[in-house]
Amino acid sequence: MNVLTNFPYQHVLVLGLAKSGTAAANVLLQNHIQVTINDGMATLEDATVQKLQTMGAELVLGSHPISVLDGKDLIVKNPGIRYDNVIVEEAQRRGIPVISEVELVHYLTNQPVIGITGSNGKTTTTTLITEMLDRSNVSVKVAGNIGVVATEVASSLQSDEKMVMELSSFQLQGIDQLQFSTAVLLNLFEAHLDYHGSFENYVEAKCNIFKSQNKHDYLIYNADDDNVSAAIKTAEATKVPFSSSRPLADGAWMDDDFLYYKDEKIIAIRDIVLVGKHNMENILAAIATAKLNGATNEGIVQVLTTFSGVKHRLEFVGVINGRYIYNDSKATNILATKKALAAFNKNVVLLAGGLDRGNTFEELIPYLHHVKAMVVFGETAGKLKDAGVAANIPVIEKALDVQHAVEVAFALTDEQDTILLSPACASWDQYKTFEERGDMFIQALHRLK
């Protein structure tokens, strides 16, 4: 196990357990740091809490008294707890540093750490980079907002291994010294404003991914995104751009037929399994990152000719009875469904609907021109039907749920057509999670084989 090195704190408050708080408390206790755990929901009946108490943690459960800050010199905050929380605000007033669990990686390993962030595409890009390195026989472990908690991975990282981390703005706001050997900034648009308070604060949190980098590190960035280009001006790292719109002498780019890294042709677009312009951007970022970290062209091509997407994110399910099936259940908002529709150019049957958050769907209308039929379901079925009528879609059917929508869609399609589940809505009117909705979609498909 790797130990905390040059860790200057003696008595740490872990605020909020869940996965990241539990992992942080474990690492701190194993390194003989005094730990107090404060969680409003956990109880002494919880086996995890009992284990941490046995290891020596002091427990303050069920409430958040200000007194938990007394004698503490560091707060490790669960990413889900906002900075306007009364404990966090008081800690900052007292000058006590507040970090997220991922910052502990700085004290646990000197191995290269690759960090990926952005408003969209993080999981797909992180997965692509990890797979490209693995197929190129580069030892790598994935962590962060995807996979295993970062401190758990860093604690066991070997001297020949690299670490790849997906990072949210919540996590990045709580880092200070963690240095990424390669940082990836995919895109920036308004998101999580309820948490950060403003777009400027959100961008500032995202930019923490490169604030500790120096000229020996790499910053992979989207040269087509004006917000990104403005944000990285102060970065000290060696900047490596990617673009889906123009050639680049010093980065990853594409034309109508091929993807390139600098002047090197990597792969024909027709050979790539993933679809969609947004996925081409993710792939370009992954290629640049992988090449800089030892990936071979052979390894990169192996991944791109077989990788069908992260589950529920415009995932290619397969060809069933001649129909091409895509599961984009993660599309819980209109923007995501617009991007999914833009990935196809003809003969799409769209399955959409879900929780009604008060949205109208006029924004979708320009993206429905190649949709031959819609199957709508859930609370928003009526609103989506109105959008379909406005787009002159010839056939619009209403289904009871996703499973029923699959049956209806097959009756409306011919061989070579595409069936796309991209709901444009959250799932909570009928399903617990978007994952459950996607799984029900796939199960219904398999029953038709």
Swiss-Prot record:
Assigned EC number: 6.3.2.9
UniProtKB keywords: ATP-binding, Cell cycle, Cell division, Cell shape, Cell wall biogenesis/degradation, Cytoplasm, Ligase, Nucleotide-binding, Peptidoglycan synthesis
Positions that bind ATP: 118-124
Reaction equations catalysed: UDP-N-acetyl-alpha-D-muramoyl-L-alanine + D-glutamate + ATP = UDP-N-acetyl-alpha-D-muramoyl-L-alanyl-D-glutamate + ADP + phosphate + H(+)
Pathway given in the UniProt record: Cell wall biogenesis; peptidoglycan biosynthesis
One GO CC term on file: cytoplasm
GO biological process: cell division; cell wall organization; peptidoglycan biosynthetic process; regulation of cell shape
GO molecular function: ATP binding; UDP-N-acetylmuramoylalanine-D-glutamate ligase activity
Subcellular location field: Cytoplasm
HAMAP family, A to Z: MurD
Family the UniProt entry places it in: Belongs to the MurCDEF family.
Purpose: Cell wall formation. Catalyzes the addition of glutamate to the nucleotide precursor UDP-N-acetylmuramoyl-L-alanine (UMA).
Protein name from the UniProt record: UDP-N-acetylmuramoylalanine--D-glutamate ligase
Organism lineage string: Bacteria, Bacillati, Bacillota, Bacilli, Bacillales
